[in-house]
């Protein structure tokens, strides 16, 4: 689980306005934070298949949000990909 302070920082960095918590940029940022936090767990616990299912679900949700953002506003998509260091 992401700590509250880290979560608030991710929201602040990706928000489009002061009270924005639901834009695709914020959602993708939070999912990326959760995914990055889980990666060390799967390096040491390779056979945690139930946990891996949750990870793959998060990755899929992030991909869908990125596809939505790309279809709505390609410039925001490109900026977010560059900021988070994700592949296209």
From Swiss-Prot:
InterPro entries: Ribosomal_uS15, Ribosomal_uS15_bac-type, uS15_NS1_RNA-bd_sf. The keyword Metal-binding does not apply. It comes from the Bacteria. Keywords: Ribonucleoprotein, Ribosomal protein, RNA-binding, rRNA-binding. One of the primary rRNA binding proteins, it binds directly to 16S rRNA where it helps nucleate assembly of the platform of the 30S subunit by binding and bridging several RNA helices of the 16S rRNA. Forms an intersubunit bridge (bridge B4) with the 23S rRNA of the 50S subunit in the ribosome. Part of the 30S ribosomal subunit. Forms a bridge to the 50S subunit in the 70S ribosome, contacting the 23S rRNA. This is Small ribosomal subunit protein uS15. It comes from Polaromonas naphthalenivorans (strain CJ2). The lineage of its organism: Bacteria, Pseudomonadati, Pseudomonadota, Betaproteobacteria, Burkholderiales. The gene is rpsO.
């Amino acid at each position: 689980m992401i700590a509250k302070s880290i979560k608030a920082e991710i929201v602040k960095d990706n928000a489009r306005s002061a009270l924005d918590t639901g834009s695709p940029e914020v959602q993708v940022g939070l999912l990326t934070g959760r995914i990055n936090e889980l990666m060390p767990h799967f390096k040491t616990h390779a056979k945690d298949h139930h946990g891996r299912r949750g990870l793959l679900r998060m990755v899929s949700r992030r991909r869908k949000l990125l596809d939505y953002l790309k279809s709505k506003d390609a410039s925001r998509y490109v900026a977010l990909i560059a900021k988070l260091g994700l592949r296209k």
